[in-house]
A protein has these predicted regions:
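Bacterial N-terminal signal peptides that target proteins for export
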Residues: 1-9
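Bacterial N-terminal signal peptides
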Residues: 10-18
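Sec/Tat signal peptide C-region and signal peptidase I cleavage site
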Residues: 19-23
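Auxiliary, metal-adjacent structural segments of Zn-dependent hydrolase domains
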Residues: 24, 69-130, 184
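Acidic/histidine-rich, surface-exposed loop or edge segments in extracytoplasmic proteins
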Residues: 30-69, 154
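Short pre-active-site segment immediately N-terminal to the catalytic Zn-binding motif
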Residues: 128-147, 159-163
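Active-site recognition of the HExxH zinc-binding catalytic motif
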Residues: 144-157, 169, 173
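Post-HExxH zinc-binding segment in Zn-dependent metallohydrolases
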Residues: 162-189
């Protein structure tokens, strides 16, 4: 019994050490709903890729926020995306807290997925349920992709019994479609 307890303790300690830098390396922006971690990323590029003009929930250009730095603007922007996705899903969890990790490109995404899959898919972003973390490639980031993954995070935390994967994809796809339609970024027919 003592060997078992020691083995479990060592395994947990190793897991904690290994996970310490998994999503929380580098710089951080703290928002109300997300802690946003980034390495080798220009936050002005992040803001420009997410078209801040669209959001009803953000007021970064108000008199009070003109002196704000880019980190507070990014925090407000991601909070606004969360609120917009919540409105589309009609799921409002004001106590929600998640993590977003911005990787410079798909290589970072691939490296994380490689630790869990033998042949990881080539994706620009994904939501990792066990860590309540959205991973997104800055090179491929757009409002639709990020909204889709945030929808997965909301769906995952809202339902007591998580819906099947296909149902989650339909809901997240609807969010992405709604955002892209509202911003005029749907592909031409």
């Amino acid at each position: 019994m003592r060997i078992f307890k020691t083995s479990v303790l060592v395994a947990l300690l190793a897991l904690l050490i290994a996970n310490a830098g998994f999503a929380q390396s580098g710089n951080v922006v703290q928002g109300k709903y997300f802690d946003i971690y980034y390495d080798d990323c220009d936050l002005t590029e992040v803001a420009s890729k997410l078209s801040a003009k669209y959001f009803l929930h953000i007021d970064v250009f108000s008199q009070d926020s003109r002196g704000s730095d880019i980190k507070s603007i990014i925090g407000q922007l991601f909070d606004s995306i969360y609120l917009e996705v919540s409105d589309i899903l009609d799921i409002h969890m004001y106590s929600f807290k998640g993590v977003i990790s911005i990787m410079p490109n798909k290589v970072g995404i691939h490296d994380i997925l490689s630790a869990y899959m033998t042949e990881p898919p080539d994706v620009p972003a994904f939501y990792f349920h066990e860590r309540n973390t959205v991973y997104v490639s800055l090179a491929d980031m757009n409002l639709g992709i990020l909204s889709h993954e945030i929808a997965h995070a909301i769906i995952d935390k809202y339902f007591v019994v998580t819906p099947p994967a296909k149902v989650q994809e339909v809901l997240a796809g609807y969010v992405e479609y709604s955002i892209r339609k509202s911003t005029g970024t749907l592909p031409a027919r």
